[in-house]
Amino acid sequence: MAVLAPLIALVYSVPRLSRWLARPYYFLSALLSAAFLLVRKLPPVCESLPTQREDGNPCDFDWREVEILMFLSAIVMMKNRRSITVEQHVGNIFMFSKVANAILFFRLDIRMGLLYITLCIVFLMTCKPPLYMGPEYIKYFSDKTIDEELERDKRVTWIVEFFANWSSDCQSFAPIYADLSLKYNCTGLNFGKVDVGRYTDVSTRYKVSTSPLTKQLPTLILFQGGKEVMRRPQIDKKGRAVSWTFSEENVIREFNLNELYQRAKKLSKAGDKIPEEQPVAAVPAAVPDEESKKDK
C-alpha cells in the first residue's frame, strides 16, 4: 500500500501535473531532478563518461549508481506516507532527486558535481514555486487591520491562518484552506490569512514563531468574541510545535467546523435578534491537560 497509494495519486493527477510542467518552476525542477539520468543515458554525452561496469558500457548505470537510486526510491516512499496533497508528493520527489543527483555527479566527476550544485543554487535564487491562485473566500489581513476586523463584530467567528510565502508547508496547505473557506464561509463564520513573514509584529503579538526550527508555520487560530479560543499546532514547553497534520479532515474535526457552520447560519438568519454576548460555538476555551498529553 505504501507504494500503490503514491502511484494512484500520481496517475489520478496527471492532468494537473501537465499544467504544472507548463510553468517554469516545475519544468526546470523536473529537468534538474532527471539531469543525471539524461547525462548517463543520452548519447553522445554518455559515451565520454567514466564507468565501473565490467562490460565497460558508459551509457548504463553501474551497481553503485543503482544502489543510490534504489535508496532514493525508498526515502521518497517513506516521506510520501505523511504527504497529503499531490504538491507535497511532487515536492518530496524533486527535493530528494536533486540530492541524489548531486551525489551521483560528484561520484562521477567533481567538476560535474560543482556545476550541478551551482545550477541548483541559481535555480533556488531565481525561481520560486507559484502561489495558489484558485478560488477562495478568504480575507487577507495586514498588521493594522487584523485587530480591527476581529473586534468589529464579536458575534462573528474567525479562523485565521498565520503563514509565510517561503514555507513549503504553507504552500501545500493553501489549496486545502481555500477549499475549506469555499465550503464553510458564511455570515457568522469567516476565514482570514495574515502573512507573518511580512508583518513580523503580528507574529510577535500572536506568539507565532517564524523560525523554521519551531515548525509553527502554518498556524490556525480560532477567534470568538475577538479572543483566541484554540490553535493548531499546539506549542510545547520548548516552544516547538507539537506534530499535527494539516489535512482537511483534521481541521474539520479539531475546529468543529460543521457545528460552527450550523450555528453561524442560525446567527445569520436571526440577524440582530441575537445579542452579541451569545456564544457562537461550543468549542472549549482551553485545551485540557489530558488532551495536550495525548496529542504530544
From Swiss-Prot:
Protein location: Endoplasmic reticulum membrane; Mitochondrion membrane
Disulfide bonds: none
Modification Phosphoserine, positions: S211, S243
Span list, region Disordered: 272-296
Start and end residues of each Thioredoxin domain: 132-269
One GO BP: brain development
Membrane-crossing residue ranges in chain numbering: 103-125
Motif extent (Di-lysine motif): 293-296
Organism superkingdom: Eukaryota
Subunit organization: Monomer. Homodimer; disulfide-linked. Occurs in both reduced and oxidized monomeric form. Oxidative conditions increase homodimerization. Interacts with CANX. Interacts with ATP2A2.
PANTHER family, per the entry: THIOREDOXIN-RELATED (PTHR15853), THIOREDOXIN-RELATED TRANSMEMBRANE PROTEIN 2 (PTHR15853:SF0)
Compositionally biased spans, kind Low complexity: 277-287
Designated name of the protein: Thioredoxin-related transmembrane protein 2
GO molecular function, one term: identical protein binding
GO cellular component, one term: endoplasmic reticulum membrane
Chief site of localization: endoplasmic reticulum
